[in-house]
Amino acid sequence: MVNCDLFVSLHQIIGMLEVKDAKIAVGGQTLAAGLSFMARDGQLTCITGPEGSGKTTLLRTLMGFLPIGSGYVSVDGELLTVKSSQAFRRMMAYLPQQIQQLRHQLMPVEAPVCEAETYGVWNALLPKAVVTEMPAPLLPEEIFQLVEQTLSDAKGKQIIIADEPAAHLTPELTLRLLQQLRDQADAGKTVLIASRRPLLVEHADLVIEMNQNT
């Protein structure tokens, strides 16, 4: 069971993420061993490394979706585990690598054309429609709009986690993204990103290199 006192203490959490002597592994492959760092509030921390080095796996571990092999992860001194992670995720805003998953946020909400009960009956009887085409890929401007909107909606979140947020952005939009992330850090938040973009890596306060020898 999750300690009920944890929910109370979350209101007092600053947001610092600490990783100590961590072993990160997936599918029997060790991606990092003895990994230690602190992602402090008010700073931009960037996890970088080649494709397949474990950046996304590390982020998922820090969010409590994956167990840590050894060592520990804590948030302002409170131990983060798979069991306690749900409480901690309430104070996190997450931008996934596949940001297209949030594309519905760009679409206006449409009113239903029939009552929910009626829809349920007919939906069970009628043959399912076949989707013949996939949605068009989002343009860089639309992706940036999603990132901007997600960050704007995260005013009450103390920790910002973003997985390759600039992957599909133009250099100009990447620069604007950097300013957005900086604004979040300047507001006293913990900002943790995974990125291979030189601009983001160079302007991070702390850079964590992921490779087989980490």
PLM segments and residue spans:
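Walker B catalytic motif
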Residues: A162-P165
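Q-loop/switch helix immediately C-terminal to the Walker
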Residues: Q98-A129
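Conserved structural motif at the start of ABC-family nucleotide-binding domains
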Residues: L17, A32-G34
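The feature captures the beta-strand-to-loop junction immediately N-terminal to the Walker
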Residues: T48-P50
